[in-house]
Amino acid sequence: MAGPGAWKRLKSLLRKDDTPLFLNDTSAFDFSDEVSDEGLSRFNKLRVVVADDDSEAPERPVNGAHPALQADDDSLLDQDLPLTNSQLSLKMDPCDNCSKRRELLKQRKVKTRLTIAAVLYLLFMIGELVGGYMANSLAIMTDALHMLTDLSAIILTLLALWLSSKSPTRRFTFGFHRLEVLSAMISVMLVYVLMGFLLYEAVQRTIHMNYEINGDVMLITAAVGVAVNVIMGFLLNQSGHHHSHAHSHSLPSNSPSMVSSGHNHGQDSLAVRAAFVHALGDLVQSVGVLIAAYIIRFKPEYKIADPICTYIFSLLVAFTTFRIIWDTVVIILEGVPSHLNVDYIKESLMKIEDVYSVEDLNIWSLTSGKSTAIVHMQLIPGSSSKWEEVQSKAKHLLLNTFGMYKCTIQLQSYRQEVIRTCANCHSSST
């Protein structure tokens, strides 16, 4: 019987074979101490093909490695291998850092535009008040009042952007988003007080007609107002940006509760678009004041045009501020935002796999544009182990598809309801 020495000699003869040792399914994994380091000089645990020249490499891939790869461990990292179709089909959502960086960049640009617009509004509003006082024109002052509403809206938007960066405290765990709502109420009340004063003066002028208007000052002020509002329109106009179509096919395009149409308008902002719409309204009003000033300048006997413009512009101010009041009331009463449909959201949640029922769904707004949801769902019997997957899908649906700011999802396994009879109700019914 051969001893251990014969076995060692046999293995050493096998190691002297010129055939390279590759890592494949048929190779033996023998890492015993009996083999010296010289015997393993051509083996590296990180290499797929161990060969010093191309002649030793096989013509077919071994263990998924390309035969033309260099005999260097780092070559696998340096080469750009083509991705397969399955790898290309994977679409990863951007990480939180990327989303935050993109949001900060967008907010910075929005703040710059709105700050410039607010400064221009403030300067010209003061100029209109001075010009209206010098011309003794209520129409000019009413136009300045309308500009005050637009200035208040821009200031509230800037306040909301500033508050969004503030962290919640132990006292105010939701943050300070509702401060925007409080500021909106105060600004609207101030506008209504000033509008009431101007309407009272307009009625007195209509009745008594004992006033004179400086047509020259009124005409110059109105002309400057038209020019300023044209500048504001160009400043706040966003129609010249490039469209980046990024359609989401999670929901049908005719969904009644889609937050956006699927277009990503670059640095497009609802706040800037709202300010642009207000600027267009101011432009129309300024043109009306300019026409009235032209009439009064060349036909002083038609000075009744001044209080008439005050009546018309007061209605315009009331119409533009009514939406602010309504949105404020809905937020305070914790109503569902107008752009969301509770029934459609519930149907979308029910379409998630392994969801048995949506027991409760509450949606409200912390402030304008920041919706919050709490949902309670039951899972179908036997699917309790999939709760993480269901929770992830529901969270993605609420945050990404419907644009929620925050959401809380409660899941529980299916439990058949047990009908319980209250003793008091039973006794009263009998």
Curated annotation (Swiss-Prot):
InterPro entries linked: Cation_efflux (IPR002524), Cation_efflux_TMD_sf (IPR027469), CDF/SLC30A (IPR050681)
Catalysed reactions listed for this entry: Zn(2+)(in) + 2 H(+)(out) = Zn(2+)(out) + 2 H(+)(in)
Chain sites annotated for binding Zn(2+): H146, D150, H278, D282
Compositionally skewed regions (Low complexity) per UniProt: 249-263
Tissue-by-tissue expression: Widely expressed. Highly expressed in the brain and in mammary epithelial cell lines.
Region (Zinc binding): 240-265
Keyword terms: Antiport, Endosome, Ion transport, Lysosome, Membrane, Metal-binding, Phosphoprotein, Transmembrane, Transmembrane helix, Transport, Zinc, Zinc transport
Example of a GO MF term: metal ion binding
Phosphoserine, modified sites: S36
Biological process terms in GO annotation: response to toxic substance; zinc export across plasma membrane; zinc ion import into lysosome; zinc ion transmembrane transport
Intervals, Lumenal compartment: 135-143, 200-216, 297-311
Membrane-side (Cytoplasmic) residue stretches: 1-113, 165-178, 238-275, 333-430
Transmembrane segments: 114-134, 144-164, 179-199, 217-237, 276-296, 312-332
A UniProt-annotated Pfam family: Cation_efflux
GO cellular component, one term: late endosome membrane
Disordered: region residues: 245-264
Annotated function: Probable proton-coupled zinc ion antiporter mediating zinc import from cytoplasm potentially into the endocytic compartment. Controls zinc deposition in milk.
Xref: NCBIfam families: CDF
Subunit structure: Homodimerization could regulate efficiency for zinc transport. Interacts with TMEM163.
Annotated family: Belongs to the cation diffusion facilitator (CDF) transporter (TC 2.A.4) family. SLC30A subfamily.
Disease: Defect in Slc30a4 is the cause of the lethal milk (lm) phenotype. Mice with lm are defective in zinc transport into breast milk, due to a premature translation termination codon at position 297. Only homozygous mutant adults develop dermatitis, skin lesions, and hair loss due to a systemic zinc deficiency. Pups of any genotype suckled on homozygous mutant female also develop symptoms characteristic of nutritional zinc deficiency, including dermatitis, alopecia and stunted growth.
Protein name: Probable proton-coupled zinc antiporter SLC30A4
Organism encoding this protein: Mus musculus (Mouse)
